């Protein structure tokens, strides 16, 4: 089928239309929410990262330079995205807890040297693995990715990269968890190396200060607004008592609870997480990262995603799907406003004028949050990607192809 001429012109036309819609949404978005006297009751002064012409043009230039585009596998593997979406949904129907680990895998991959599937590589005689970095020891869902990759290889051997597979699987995980859809370009290539040392030091810890978190996101091009929106993924998944017990019993080595914790919530948590003499600050991140992770139990799990220490109580971050799927994200921000954030790094979002502003905005306007979260996930999923000859397409996501 021809459209306004040949295929290349059609692709350019579609790209311009998509960018125009994307920009128009943000103009409407700015008009509705970034003016004084908003529905959120917050006077917004920070500019959207998409507000000015320079950013709009830079997005267009990036598309011109990039090998990424929509429907990249249209000819080489036309059913690729459908296969990935169906596989994640089929697994979700059996194991609903599959979504948070896949979303967390995406973050832990993209945050370290970009979205190149390096987090999926196993160690071998010559290379270390990011899986062995302490922040990644609780990562789950590798077997889910392997299962989907196997399906793709049966249909289109050696075509779909693990990096594309992971970003598309994470998008489907967001959808089944009640989050928004967002369009993704494809054409990423896989890294031939892993970056364990970077993963060890760059992934934010659960007790990281707000300044450290914002600095690490800023280094990767995310402003406060986008960073806060990504934290909304903490409205699903689980975390272990081990990783916040110090807030209940020995905050900052005072022998007392964190004074910022809501008193009623504190008592609720103490009931679920009784005191033990080993209570101290965790040395590794919890099963909730940015985004969160891990199924709440192994009883419904057919993919080996064990919940770590079975003797350690866990907290359901959705609080039994409080408010329903339509409150994906917003329930998290509302609880922060009530001083009911589990991690210090969560509650600290209320400790800065700018981040608090966005917490309140997202808590009061689910549509605003869903738009912002979708845009931030698009940005995260395209961070520092490998394209063209810079990467490879692995046939097994855990093993790099031999270098020529």
UniProtKB/Swiss-Prot annotation:
Site (Transition state stabilizer) location in chain: 104
Note accompanying the cofactor annotation: Binds 1 heme b (iron(II)-protoporphyrin IX) group per subunit.
Disulfide links within the chain: 77-156, 110-115, 162-397, 241-273
Protein localization: Secreted
Family, per entry: Belongs to the peroxidase family. Classical plant (class III) peroxidase subfamily.
Record-listed substrate binding positions: 204
Biased composition (Polar residues): 296-307
Function (record text): Removal of H(2)O(2), oxidation of toxic reductants, biosynthesis and degradation of lignin, suberization, auxin catabolism, response to environmental stresses such as wounding, pathogen attack and oxidative stress. These functions might be dependent on each isozyme/isoform in each plant tissue.
Chain residue ranges for the region called Disordered: 276-307
Residues annotated as catalytic: 108 (proton acceptor)
Cofactor dependency: heme b; Ca(2+)
Protein name from the UniProt record: Putative Peroxidase 48
One protein family per Pfam: peroxidase
InterPro entries noted in UniProt: Haem_peroxidase, Haem_peroxidase_sf, Peroxidase_pln, Peroxidases_AS, Secretory_peroxidase
């Amino acid at each position: 089928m021809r459209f306004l001429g040949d295929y290349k012109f059609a692709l350019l036309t579609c790209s311009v239309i998509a960018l125009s819609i994307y920009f128009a949404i943000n103009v409407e978005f700015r008009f509705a929410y970034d003016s004084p006297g908003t529905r959120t009751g917050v006077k917004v002064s920070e500019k959207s990262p998409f507000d000015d012409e320079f950013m709009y043009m830079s997005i267009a230039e990036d598309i011109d330079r990039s090998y990424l585009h929509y429907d990249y596998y249209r000819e080489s593997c036309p059913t690729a995205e459908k296969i990935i979406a169906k596989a994640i949904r089929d697994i979700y129907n059996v194991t609903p807890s599959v979504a948070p680990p896949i979303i967390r895998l995406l973050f832990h991959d993209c945050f370290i040297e970009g979205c190149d599937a390096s987090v999926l590589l196993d160690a071998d005689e010559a290379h270390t693995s990011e899986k062995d970095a302490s922040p990644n020891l609780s990562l789950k869902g590798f077997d889910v990715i392997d299962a989907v990759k196997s399906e793709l290889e049966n249909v289109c051997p050696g075509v779909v990269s693990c990096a594309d597979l992971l970003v598309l699987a994470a998008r489907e995980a967001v959808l089944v968890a009640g989050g928004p859809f967002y369009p993704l370009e494809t054409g990423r290539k896989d890294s031939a190396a892993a970056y364990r040392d970077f993963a060890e030091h760059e992934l934010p810890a659960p007790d990281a200060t707000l300044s450290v978190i914002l600095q690490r996101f800023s280094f990767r091009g995310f402003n406060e607004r986008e960073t806060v929106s990504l934290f909304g993924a903490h409205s699903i998944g689980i975390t272990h008592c081990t990783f916040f017990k110090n807030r209940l019993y020995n905050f900052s080595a005072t022998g007392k609870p964190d004074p910022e914790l809501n008193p009623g919530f504190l008592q609720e948590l103490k009931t679920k997480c009784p005191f033990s003499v080993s209570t101290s600050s965790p040395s590794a991140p919890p099963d909730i990262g940015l985004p969160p992770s891990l199924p709440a139990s192994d009883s419904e799990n057919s993919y080996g995603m064990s919940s770590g220490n079975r003797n350690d109580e866990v907290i359901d971050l959705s609080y039994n799907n409080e408010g329903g799927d339509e409150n994906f994200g917003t329930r998290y921000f509302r609880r922060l406003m009530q001083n009911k954030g589990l991690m210090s790094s969560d509650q600290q979002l209320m400790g800065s004028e700018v981040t608090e502003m966005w917490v309140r905005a997202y808590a009061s306007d689910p549509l605003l949050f869903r738009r912002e979260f979708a845009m931030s996930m698009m940005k995260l999923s395209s961070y520092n990607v490998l394209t063209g000859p810079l990467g490879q397409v692995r046939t097994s996501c855990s093993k790099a192809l031999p270098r020529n």
